[in-house]
């Protein structure tokens, strides 16, 4: 099969499982055969699908450890080829951040050491880190709780003017697993003398995407809705907070909280977005419940 055909197969298996037409068995079989692929577009699709599988395992569980091992097996040979070899191929250049990010997730020692070394080389001026890898490297340093990195990046975020660098720092800061650090971001991002109000959404979005901090961010949204209304009411960003909740909430309790909270919000302009968010959460819950045992069995048999 050609590259386009392989991508279409992966995409089709994803959509069919998402909408309940089949389970993830075919997707897992396709992923299992993808470790040798070198095309950046296929690597990117495999990365996205394996990232989605993390929803099906509990944090810090044996199943998550097994999933990380599976992910490592898919990307390790590409890391060896691209990072330890010498290649200027544009396809490989585009694949580098994808591969590095997935191996950091997998807790691969060589990938983590690569991030540590690159960060230390440029600790005095992180803008000099390769821009294609910078977000991955900084996020790895924060996620792995390297001493002093979070505070350094937060102070830099408050002073730096470069938009691309600010976004990379924001992405890194929201990779934290420390709830006190998440609270610091949420509190600090409402101080308009320090940060533009619209930047608050970037922090919320990142913290909601992060499974370790999602509950903290969701709690903040519900308990600071008056601030959101005051700052963004009538603005195009207003419904973004509803969208990000619908995009990431993933438990039965969170669905109940979502429905109860937005039922009490009198905002006709948000009604359609609220309904779409509810439907997204319901569909996600069905997908999780249908496929959790399938992934668990796959990992037991394979690993």
Give the role of each language-model region.
Residues 1-303:
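Long, ordered, helix-rich scaffold segments
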């Amino acid at each position: 099969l050609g590259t386009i055909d392989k991508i279409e197969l992966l995409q089709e298996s994803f959509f069919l499982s998402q909408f309940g037409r089949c389970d993830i068995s075919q997707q897992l079989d396709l992923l299992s055969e993808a470790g040798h692929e070198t095309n950046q577009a296929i690597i990117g699709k495999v990365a996205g699908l394996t990232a989605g599988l993390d929803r099906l395992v509990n944090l810090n569980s044996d199943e998550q450890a097994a999933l990380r091992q599976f992910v490592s097996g898919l990307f390790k040979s590409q890391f060896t080829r691209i990072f330890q070899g010498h290649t200027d191929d544009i396809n490989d250049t585009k694949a580098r951040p994808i591969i590095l990010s997935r191996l950091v997730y997998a807790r691969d020692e060589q990938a983590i050491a690569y991030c540590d070394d690159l960060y230390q080389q440029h600790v005095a001026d992180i803008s000099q880190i390769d821009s294609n890898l910078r977000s991955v490297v900084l996020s790895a340093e924060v996620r792995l709780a390297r001493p002093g990195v979070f505070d350094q990046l937060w102070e830099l975020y408050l002073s730096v003017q470069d938009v691309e660098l600010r976004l990379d720092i924001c992405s890194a800061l929201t990779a934290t697993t420390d709830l006190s650090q998440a609270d610091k971001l949420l509190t600090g991002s409402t101080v308009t003398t320090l940060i533009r109000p619209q930047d608050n959404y970037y922090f919320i979005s990142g913290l909601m995407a992060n499974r370790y901090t999602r509950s903290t961010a969701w709690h903040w949204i519900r308990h600071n809705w008056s601030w959101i209304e005051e700052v963004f009411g009538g603005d195009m960003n207003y419904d973004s907070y509803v969208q990000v909740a619908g995009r990431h909430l993933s438990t039965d309790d969170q669905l109940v909280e979502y429905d109860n909270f937005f039922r009490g919000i009198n905002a006709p302009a948000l009604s359609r977005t609220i309904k779409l968010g509810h439907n997204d959460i319901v569909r996600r819950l069905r997908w999780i419940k249908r496929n959790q045992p399938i992934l668990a069995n796959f990992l037991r048999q394979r690993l």
